[in-house]
Amino acid sequence: DSEICVNTSRVERYQIDSNHLSTALFFSVYFPPCYSDMQPDGYPTLYALHGQNFTDEMWIDLGAAEKMDKLILEGEIEPFLMVMPFEEYFFREAEGNQFPLALSEEIIPWVEGNLNVCTKKNCRAIAGISRGASWAVRIGLSEWKDFGSIGAHSLPTFRKDIDALPDWLAAISSGKEPRFYMDTGRFDPEVKT
């Protein structure tokens, strides 16, 4: 039996137990219009990390779902899932923070084991805004074998990451570098002109 296509997306929120954090892990998932559990090869996945003082709902509040729906339905981009983890302790220092382990060892395996997604490196992207961009760069470069693309929007970088950057880049095999996208808003209060 073929599934009936419904030309609307949906966002669902999930909670899973975590061995790395002292609380449960929460994350939202954007499912594109006409999502199907039967899609051959699965869907590409974007792990979108929110900024400090925000939640996993930040991307939806910014209108990302409507923009993605429009681009997908107009054939401008291929359908994909956007996974939006919630970093509950976003005021903690990055050093010693278990959020990256919770993402790579708990959220990603759960998504890939329960949803119809492509599990190849080039099907997996990580991006974030502000603090989320710092995590995206750290996780994407230090775990470069897992991500085909990295997006950093209004990137502040964690303090020690500037020193680690040359080592992360040197560890990446030639020709295996992830695609890298970086931008900042013209009116970002932290941008000095």
Where are these regions (language model features)?
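Non-catalytic cap/lid and distal C-terminal segments of serine-dependent acyl enzymes
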Residues: 1-193
